[in-house]
Structure formats: structure tokens, C-alpha cells
A protein has these predicted regions:
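Intrinsically disordered, low-complexity segments enriched in small/polar residues
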Residues: 33, 38, 53, 120, ...
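A short, surface-exposed interaction/processing loop segment used at functional sites
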Residues: 107-136
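C-terminal partner/receptor-binding element of secreted or periplasmic proteins
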Residues: 129-149
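Exposed beta-strand-loop-beta-strand "reactive/processing" segments of non-cytosolic proteins
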Residues: 55-101
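Negatively charged, low-complexity tracts enriched in Asp/Glu with abundant Ser/Thr
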Residues: 2-68, 75-76
């Protein structure tokens, strides 16, 4: 594998993670706004005094972890267990919480995760061949439903 191909796969994987982050942030915003429409309660964590949506203080984001064969697309969530008085709590900060997808470093194939360590069999998408369909799926269903057959 050439360096150009490796960088291309990693660049597309980064773009894929950015799309997931963007789509998920929009989904979370719509859920909160629709909740206000239903019950009229505006939580001070997400809305200012004027009723405008402000977003989250430590919103989750998606990135990838480089492995031997795959790039692992993971959700990073803010954890601060020490604030709840837990003994031996991990320091506050972002930690990987769930695997969203696996991306083959050589071919650019996108796989559904079977577990934290391994992908399911059968590629769902290819970052090079049908990138537009993949990104459209991300924008419509940011939690990974587009990866199921």
C-alpha cells in the first residue's frame, strides 16, 4: 500500500467522522427543540434566557483510532465521574464509548461493528466507490441505521 492511499483512506475516514458528528449534533438539537414544542419546558443546559438553543457544553464527537488492519470510528463522550463522588474515578475528559464503524485501511470498505474489537462480516459501503450514498445515509440516520442491510 502506498502512502498516498493510506493518507487518502485516513482523510476520507476523518471526513466520515466529521459528517457523523455534524449529523448527530443536528439530530440532538432537533430532539431538544421538539421536546420544548411538546411540553414547553426549556432546560437551562441547552437554552438561554431568550429561549435560543445554545448547544451542549461537552458535546460528543466522532473520531477514529488507528489499528493494525482497520480504522475504528468511535464516539467520544465526556466523562467526569469524580463530580459524582466516585472513588478512583477516571480524570475528567473525553473517552471512547462506542464503536460506530470499522474502515479497512487498504480498501476503504466500511463495516458494521460486531464488537469493540472486530467488524461484522461483509462490507456495507466503500469510501471510494459510493461516498455520496454513505454520507447521505449518515445525514439521514446518524446513529448507524444505514449500515444495516
Amino acid at each position: 500500500m502506498t502512502t498516498a492511499t493510506k493518507q487518502t483512506v485516513e482523510t476520507l475516514a476523518q471526513e466520515y467522522c466529521e459528517k457523523i458528528t455534524e449529523a448527530n449534533a443536528e439530530w440532538r438539537k432537533q430532539v431538544r427543540i421538539n421536546g420544548v414544542k411538546e411540553d414547553g419546558y426549556k432546560c437551562k443546559l441547552w437554552f438561554d434566557e431568550d429561549g435560543n438553543y445554545t448547544g451542549e457544553k461537552n458535546a460528543p464527537y466522532w473520531t477514529y483510532i488507528i489499528g493494525r488492519k482497520y480504522l475504528k470510528g468511535v464516539a467520544m463522550e465526556w466523562k467526569d465521574d469524580a463530580q459524582y463522588g466516585r472513588i478512583n474515578a477516571a480524570p475528567a475528559g473525553y473517552q471512547a464509548s462506542t464503536v460506530h464503524a470499522f474502515i479497512d485501511k487498504k480498501t476503504g470498505d466500511v463495516f458494521l461493528p460486531a464488537s469493540w474489537n472486530a467488524p461484522a462480516k461483509g462490507a456495507r459501503f466503500n469510501l471510494f466507490q459510493n461516498k455520496e450514498a454513505l454520507f447521505e445515509g449518515v445525514m439521514n440516520r446518524p446513529h448507524g441505521g444505514y449500515l444495516y442491510r
